Amino acid sequence: MTRLYKTTNGIDYIEHLNHIRPPGDKSNEHAMFFGIDATAHMLLRRDNPSSPTRSQALLGTALPPYQDWEWRRLNVRIGGPSIIQIAPNKVIACIRRYGNGNWTELGWIDIKKASYEPAIRLPSGGDTSYAGLVWRDMKLWISYYSSHEGKTSIYLSKAIIE
């Protein structure tokens, strides 16, 4: 279950919304960001082995006060999502992909079209996921773990985004 909390002092929190995810959906991991216009965006992993389309990620959007969410299906199955907005209309996701093995990948999210476009496959494989993203000085720093070199290790990558 995903909940939103609010605070006025950074110490005491109260529940704002009890259940964001679509009712009855087999969703679990998520990542979110707030756009410069205060719109909330959430990238949501779903698992439903009986239906390929019901395993595709969802992109959720809500305006303040974040009570009503619109959910649209993305064209990709994901794991361990991380998402960051680096400029207006420039949203990058780092996800675990499934296919012929697992790998960690950077890609572009088009918020308006609710679509995902792969950009680069990071050195990864096996047990890999859960990236952290930092945008600083026009560079994207990515930390993630992977077991593609045998023992599971943590990796740090830097990407120049044009």
Predicted regions and their residues:
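Beta-rich carbohydrate-recognition and catalytic domains
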Residues: M1-G80, I84-G126, W135-E162
